[in-house]
Amino acid sequence: MINRNEINENDKWDLSFLFANEEEYVKTINAIEIKTKEFKKYEKLELNFDLFKETLNKYYEIMEDLEKVSYYAMLQLETDVTNKDSNKIYSICVNLATKVSNTTSYFMPKILKTDEKKIQAWINDPELKDKKIAIEKILREKKHILSEQEEKILANYTPLYTSYQSIFSALTNADMEFGEINKHPLTNSTYTLFLQNEDQKIRKEAFLRFYQKYKNNENTLANLIISDFKKNHFIAKTRRFQNTFSMQLFSNNIDKKVYTNLIETVNENLPVLNDYYEFRKKVLNQEYLYHYDVYVPLTKGIIFKNSFEDACEKILKSLEVLGNEYTKILRNGLLKERWVDKYENTGKRSGAFSAGSYNGKPYILLNYKDESIRDMFTLAHEAGHSMHSYFSIKNNPFPHYNYSIFEAEIASIINEQILAEYLLKNETDTNKIKYIKLTQIDDMISTFFRQTMFAEFEYIIHEMISKEEPVVKETLTETYMNLLKKYFGPSLKFDELSPLECLRIPHFYSPFYVYQYATGIAAALSIYKGIKENKKDAVENYIKFLKTGGSKYPLDSLNITGVDLTKKATIENTINIFKCRLEEIKKIFQ
C-alpha cells in the first residue's frame, strides 16, 4: 500500500477551504482561547435583552470556530493516523473542546432559569431571528432539566453512562479471539466475509466458531445489555419521561406512531420477506436455508470496471433528474473543488463518510477501487449526504443548519436509487443486471427489514423494563429467536446459537436508534417514487427539504415532500417496491 505523500494532490481533498495554511489555523485556535476566557465574565451577570443577545452571539461564534478547527483536525487525522503532526493537532482540538465545554456549560442552564416569557419575547426580536429556532428547541427541554445540584450529580456520573458499551467493545473486539479459518483470521469485521464464501462448510465453521465464543461469554454480554437498558430507563425517569422510548423520541419531536406504524405494517407484510428466503433457498438448491446461508451471493464472477472519473460521470448523468442546480454544484465539488479524498493509503481510515461543517466544503472520504461497483454506489451515497449538507449550509444560519440523524439517510438513499435505475436502463449484460437488482434487494433487507426487526426487539425489552417485569438472559434470547423465526419464515432452520446475535449488536447500546435506518429508506423511496413518476413539484419539494436543514423538526421537514411516516401507505410503498423487485429477479433466474 502506498504512503500518503505518494498520493497525487488532485486525488486528495482540498482542506484549504477550511484553512489556507497552518498559521491561519493556529490563529483561529488562539482566537477561540481568548473568546472562551472572555465568555466566563457573563456567568454571574443577570440577563437582560442586550446581554442575552451579546452572550448568544459570542456563544455561537465560539461554537462555529470550534467546529471549523475540529473538522480540520479530524479530516487530517482520518487520512493518516500515523502522522504525528495530525495526531498533535487533533489532541490540541480535543483539549480545546473540553475547555470550551467546561467554560460555556453554564449558559444553556442560565437560559432555562430565566423567565420563559422574557426569553420568548427576546428571541422574537428581528436581531435574533437566526437563533430563534435553536433557542425554542432548548426551551422545550425545560421541564426535563433538574435542579442545579441534581444536574451536577448526573453530570458526575456521565463517564459511567458509556461504561457498559465500553466493556462490550473491549470484550468483543479485544478479549474474544475467534482463531483462523484456512489461515485467515476470523474477527467481528471479517465474519460477514466468511458468510459470503461459496463453500457452505466454511460458512458453517465460521458461524459455529464465532457464536461459540459469544456462548462462552453469554452471561456477561446479557448482563451488560440489560444493565445498559436499565440505566437508560433510570435516566429517563429521573428526567421526568415516562420511559426510554419517550425520552429518545422527544428531542426530534418524533410522533410515537412513526415507530409503532413501522413495526405493525412490516409485521402485516412479512410473507413478502419470507418469500424472498424461499426464493434464495431454491437458487442455492438447498432443502433448507441455515442462518449462515443468508449472505452468500447469488451471482459470482461479475466484474465492473469504472475509474473514479467514469463513476462521477455516470452518477452525475443519472442525477440530472434532480435538476441543473443539483448536478452543477455536485460536478464542481467532485471534479473541480476536490471535495473527495479518493484512494486508499497507509494509515487512512477504512470505509467512507461525508463530513460537512458550516465552513469549508462537505468533504467525502473514500477508499475507491475501480473494479468495485459498490464503491461507485458508495460515492453516490456519500454525495447525497454532502449535497444535503451543502444546501443546508447555504440556506441556514449556523445554529439551524445541522439536520438530524432521522433525516440523514434520505438524501443518500435517493441517490443510490436513481443511480441503480440509470445503470439498469443502460445495461445489456444479464449477469450485471442480476447483480444490481440483487444488490438492491439485499440493501432493502439489511436497511429496512433487519433494522425493523432490531427495532421491534428493542421495543419489547425496553417495554418490559419500563413495566418492571423481570428481564434475564433467556428473555433476550427467547424474544430474539421468536423474531428470527417470524422475519425469516419457514425456509430457514436456526441453530441454538442463532439468538446470541442479539448480544453482538453495538447499536443496541444507542437506544431507539436503528429504526431511523428503516424510516429513512421508507421516506427516501416515497420521495423517489414521486421523482420517478414525474409528479408535480416532486423534485422542487425535495430540494426544498434539503435546504431546510435543521430549521424544522424532522417530520415537519419531511412534510414539505408530502411524506407522512405515521401512515401505513408510506411503509407499504417500500414493501411493494421490494415485492416488485423480487418478482423481477425471480423472472431473470427462471
Curated annotation (Swiss-Prot):
Essential cofactor(s): Zn(2+)
InterPro entries named in the record: OligopepF_N_dom (IPR013647), OligoPept_F_C (IPR042088), Pept_M3A_M3B (IPR045090), Pept_M3A_M3B_dom (IPR001567), Peptidase_M3B (IPR004438)
Protein EC: 3.4.24.-
GO biological process: peptide metabolic process; proteolysis
UniProt cross-references to Gene3D superfamilies, sorted A to Z: Oligoendopeptidase f, C-terminal domain (1.10.1370.20), Oligopeptidase f, N-terminal domain (1.20.140.70), putative peptidase helix hairpin domain like (1.10.287.830)
Domain of life: Bacteria
Binding-site positions, Zn(2+): 381, 385, 388
GO molecular function: metal ion binding; metalloendopeptidase activity
An annotated GO cellular component: cytosol
Keywords of this entry: Hydrolase, Metal-binding, Metalloprotease, Protease, Zinc
Catalytic residues identified in the record: 382
SUPFAM superfamilies: Metalloproteases ('zincins'), catalytic domain
Enzymatic class: hydrolase
Manner of cofactor binding, per the entry note: Binds 1 zinc ion.
One Pfam assignment: Peptidase_M3
PANTHER family xref list: PROTEASE M3 THIMET OLIGOPEPTIDASE-RELATED (PTHR11804), SACCHAROLYSIN (PTHR11804:SF84)
UniProt family annotation: Belongs to the peptidase M3B family.
Protein name: Oligoendopeptidase F homolog
Source species: Borreliella burgdorferi (strain ATCC 35210 / DSM 4680 / CIP 102532 / B31)
